[in-house]
């Protein structure tokens, strides 16, 4: 059994920023692989909508899978649209059309308006 004094402390759940070094048997240190996730952003949105509500790690995992799934669907559809129109670049127009095709009714309208707002904010900040 490894000596607990030599091993690095476990990083906090949900926090994927810090790359801690792990002690190997031969004394050399190696970096732990980073796990990318949307947990920080999901948490920020949760606090904007419901400041007094928390989220379990299991629920965060589900939300992370959901965001990854939606991202892949939109990217795939946008890629197809660009290919159909003989374009090599995915622009905000392809993303917007992909969102309209993938999301139902009112949800698509809200997503498009929020996306347009985000792009406008980004463009004006440049």
UniProtKB/Swiss-Prot annotation:
PTM-bearing positions, type Omega-N-methylarginine: 87, 93
InterPro entries membership: Histone-fold, Histone_H2A/H2B/H3, Histone_H2B, HISTONE_H2B_site
Positions of modified residues (N6-butyryllysine): 6, 21
Record: glycosylation sites: 113
Predominant cellular place of this UniProt entry's protein: nucleus
Chain positions covered by the region annotation Disordered: 1-36
Annotated positions of the N6-succinyllysine modification: 35, 117, 121
Residues bearing the modification N6-malonyllysine: 117
Positions carrying N6-(beta-hydroxybutyryl)lysine: 6, 12, 17, 21, 35, 86, 117, 121
Positions of post-translational N6-(2-hydroxyisobutyryl)lysine modification: 6, 13, 21, 24-25, 35, 44, 47, 58, 86, 109, 117, 121
Glycyl lysine isopeptide (Lys-Gly) (interchain with G-Cter in SUMO2) crosslink location in chain: 6, 21
Pfam families: Histone
Modified residues (N6,N6,N6-trimethyllysine): 86
Protein name, per record: Histone H2B type 2-F
Species, as recorded: Homo sapiens (Human)
Phylogenetic classification of the source organism: Eukaryota, Metazoa, Chordata, Craniata, Vertebrata
């Amino acid at each position: 059994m490894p000596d607990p004094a030599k091993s690095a402390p476990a990083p906090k759940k949900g926090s994927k920023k810090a790359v801690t070094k792990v002690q190997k048997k031969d004394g050399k240190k190696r970096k732990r692989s980073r796990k990318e996730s949307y947990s920080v952003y999901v948490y920020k949105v949760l606090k904007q909508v419901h400041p007094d509500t928390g989220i379990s790690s299991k629920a965060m995992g589900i939300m992370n899978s959901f965001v990854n799934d939606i991202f892949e669907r939109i990217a795939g559809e946008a890629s197809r649209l660009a290919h159909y129109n003989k374009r090599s670049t995915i622009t905000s127009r392809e993303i917007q059309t992909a969102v309209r095709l993938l999301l139902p009714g009112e949800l698509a309208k809200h997503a498009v308006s929020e996306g347009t707002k985000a792009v406008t904010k980004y463009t004006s900040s440049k």
